[in-house]
Amino acid sequence: LIIASKGRITTISSISGILSGANAGVYSMSKHAIEAFGDSLALQMESHGVKVSLVEPGNYNSEIGNTAARRMGTTTSLADRSKYKSPDEVADAVSLALFEPEPKRRYMVVPNQYEGEITIKKAIQELVQLNEGHAYTYDRDTLVKMLDEALATARPAR
């Protein structure tokens, strides 16, 4: 049905699919897996006209800490998120992924500049690590040119 209707698939991931925090290995691993699945699924479904998007929220007010504590059989919450920002922006991103004419592949949704900055810096750090110390390393000018080409295809900020 999804192929026949040229529908949409939207998966909730996390910035933890890009970042890997201390003491969060299993959670980060699961989010990295969702990222890989979303990327593969998007490529697989592209020829069928099905759009696939990942929504990657940062830290918002949610029950994730309480839910994890219950699953582990403890009454102590792992993270009190009651003072965090409401997840309305995450819901808005899901709506865009499902209903805008040309959805983005990724919707990183963070509650503040800091979370956006550390996520982008981590992605850049991984790029640098991938590029160093092998026979096909690119120089700075080539990397900047590649980045400029990628930025030329990016959508403007809303």
Spans of features found by a protein language model:
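Active-site helix of classical SDR
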Residues: 30-33
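SDR active-site lid
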Residues: 47-104
